[in-house]
Each structure stands twice: as structure tokens, then as C-alpha cells.
């Protein structure tokens, strides 16, 4: 009996200590969020779509419009793409869409099927006065949206430039670890991510050309836009969304794909490359360029990619 009482006492004390630690972290996080509020000022224009605010960033005044579409879970699409689009804005009009749940856009707890996502992207561009046709530049998971865009509204898409973009085949046997993803969301919501060294240091911060001020802004956004409810809904729908695109017709537009070494994708290099090769081989005149870097290719090889994009468009 004494041993049992001692065990219960130890368990009670342990839980109490844990609760105190979590409370301290939570309060600290709230204080930091308040201090960082001044950094969370939209870098572009905010438009309203169906009662929700969506962030749209534009730069440059070229005849052709490049629309950058971020990968799943990228906290700050604008700053993530900046190293690359700053190399292109002298020649083209640059647009970055920050979907709901990302960057400076609203967080919503709504279904994220492919039609909803695409309709919101198109409506946001219309609200911002941006007209097509567009050269879509999707990273990772946004490759699915870009392909669907070209399938459904071919007159609006003149080309696709995939920045290590995902293709439908990649999600056929994709196993979602929703408990882990939701645990990450919980950890960020209560502030645990703040005490994990280096977790806010994105590829854009580590390898891109962001200024110290922009890095500071990125970190502030990270703690507000990591594993948001909207992102979780998006992940839950990705297999269905990919299947819809896979069942559609192949886009009849020029496609250039930049392919990474697979690091950071969840697949090994051989698997990841095979997915992309299988897809591009079906596209008439499609081209793939291999890069020996990890998944966020635009943060590593921005100079090389910018050069190839200019050659491709010309």
C-alpha cells in the first residue's frame, strides 16, 4: 500500500510539474505573440473572398504574369519565394497567392477540396485586378492545384513551371499521419515550438537572400501560421484532390519541372524523381531539370532556376 501511495504521489507531482511547465510556456508564447504583433503587417494587398481575407503580393510590371503557389505548410509563401521572384520581377509581373491558413491570410476551419481552393485563388486574383493568362509556378503540393487549374480553365494558364511540384501519382499510396500532424499543431498553439532550437529557421532563412528584417518577420509569421486548422483540412483532402486531377485530362500547356534530390519530400530520391519523370514523359514538349538540392529548390538554386525560367519563357 505504501508503494502504491508513493507511486500515486509521484505521478501527481509529475503531472503538476508538467502542467506548470506547459502553463509557463503558454503564457510566454502569448507574451511573445503580442510583442511580435507589429511584425505581422501584410506585405501585400488583402482582398476579401466569401467573407475571408486573402493576402496577394505583387511586384514588377512585365507583360507575362508569374503566379507563385506555395507548398503545403509553408508559413510565409511571400518570403519563401522572395529569393527567386526578386530575380525575375524586372522582366515579369510577379504574383504570390497566400491561401487561407497561410501567411497573412485568414485561418478558417472549412473543407479544403480542390474546387474550393482553386475558386478562392481565382477569386482573389480577380479582386486584386490581376488578369490572366498566367504562368503558374507551384511548389510541392500546389502542383495538384496548378494542374487542376490548367485542366478546368485552360484559357487562364499559358504554362506551368513546377518548383519540385507534386504530381498525382505521389499521393496514390501516401500515408497520412494525422495524429502526428495534429500533435504538431497542438505544440505550436501552446508555444512548445518556441523552445525547440532552430525550428523556425526555414529554408528561406537559412539559404535564401532575405534581409535580417525579413527573417525576423518570417519567424513571427511562423509562430502564427504553423499547422493551422486550414492546413490540416488541406492535408486531409490531398489524396482525394490528387485523385480528381489524376482522373482528368493531361494539361495541354508547356510544362517545365525542376526536380530536387528528394530530401524533405518524404520519399527517397529514386521514388520522387520517378513520380515526376512518369508525369513529364506524358507531356508533349515537357522538360525536367534535375537539381542536387533539397525540396525547397527555390531557396537553394534561385539563380539557376531564374536563368532557366527566363530561357523557358522566351
For each predicted feature, which ranges?
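Alpha/beta-hydrolase fold catalytic core
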Residues: 2-66, 90-92, 314
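Conserved HGGG/HGGXW glycine-rich cap/lid loop of the alpha/beta-hydrolase fold
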Residues: 55-104
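Active-site loop/oxyanion-hole signature of alpha/beta-hydrolase fold enzymes
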Residues: 96-137
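Residue in the alpha/beta-hydrolase core beta-strand immediately N-terminal to the catalytic nucleophile
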Residues: 134-135, 159-161
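Flexible "cap/lid" loop of the alpha/beta hydrolase fold
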Residues: 161-189
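Conserved serine/cysteine hydrolase catalytic core
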Residues: 210-284
Amino acid at each position: 500500500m505504501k508503494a502504491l501511495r508513493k507511486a500515486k504521489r509521484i505521478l501527481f507531482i509529475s503531472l503538476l510539474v508538467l502542467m506548470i511547465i506547459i502553463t509557463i510556456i503558454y503564457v510566454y508564447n502569448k507574451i511573445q505573440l503580442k510583442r511580435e504583433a507589429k511584425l505581422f503587417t501584410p506585405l501585400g494587398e488583402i482582398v476579401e473572398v466569401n467573407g475571408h481575407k486573402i493576402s496577394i503580393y505583387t511586384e514588377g510590371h512585365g507583360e507575362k504574369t508569374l503566379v507563385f503557389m506555395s507548398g503545403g505548410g509553408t508559413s510565409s509563401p511571400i518570403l519563401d519565394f522572395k529569393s527567386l521572384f526578386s530575380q525575375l520581377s524586372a522582366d515579369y509581373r510577379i504574383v504570390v497567392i497566400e491561401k487561407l491558413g497561410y501567411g497573412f491570410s485568414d485561418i478558417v476551419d472549412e473543407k479544403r477540396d480542390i474546387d474550393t481552393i482553386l475558386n478562392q485563388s481565382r477569386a482573389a486574383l480577380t479582386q486584386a485586378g490581376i488578369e490572366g493568362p498566367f504562368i503558374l509556378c507551384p511548389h510541392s503540393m500546389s502542383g495538384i492545384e496548378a494542374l487542376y487549374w490548367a485542366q478546368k480553365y485552360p484559357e487562364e494558364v499559358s504554362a506551368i513551371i513546377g518548383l519540385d511540384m507534386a504530381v498525382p501519382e505521389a499521393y496514390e499510396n501516401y500515408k497520412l499521419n494525422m495524429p502526428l500532424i495534429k500533435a504538431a499543431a497542438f505544440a505550436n498553439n501552446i508555444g512548445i515550438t518556441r523552445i525547440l532550437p532552430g525550428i523556425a529557421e526555414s529554408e528561406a532563412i537559412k539559404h535564401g537572400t532575405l534581409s535580417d528584417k525579413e527573417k525576423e518577420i518570417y519567424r513571427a509569421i511562423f509562430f502564427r501560421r504553423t499547422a493551422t486548422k486550414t492546413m490540416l483540412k488541406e492535408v486531409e483532402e490531398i489524396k482525394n484532390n490528387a485523385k480528381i486531377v489524376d482522373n482528368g485530362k493531361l494539361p495541354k500547356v508547356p510544362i517545365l519541372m525542376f526536380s530536387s534530390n528528394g530530401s524533405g519530400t518524404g520519399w527517397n530520391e529514386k521514388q520522387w524523381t520517378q513520380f515526376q519523370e512518369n508525369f513529364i514523359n506524358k507531356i508533349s514538349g515537357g522538360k525536367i531539370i534535375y537539381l542536387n538540392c533539397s525540396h525547397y529548390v527555390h531557396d537553394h538554386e534561385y539563380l539557376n532556376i531564374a536563368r532557366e525560367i527566363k530561357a523557358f519563357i522566351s
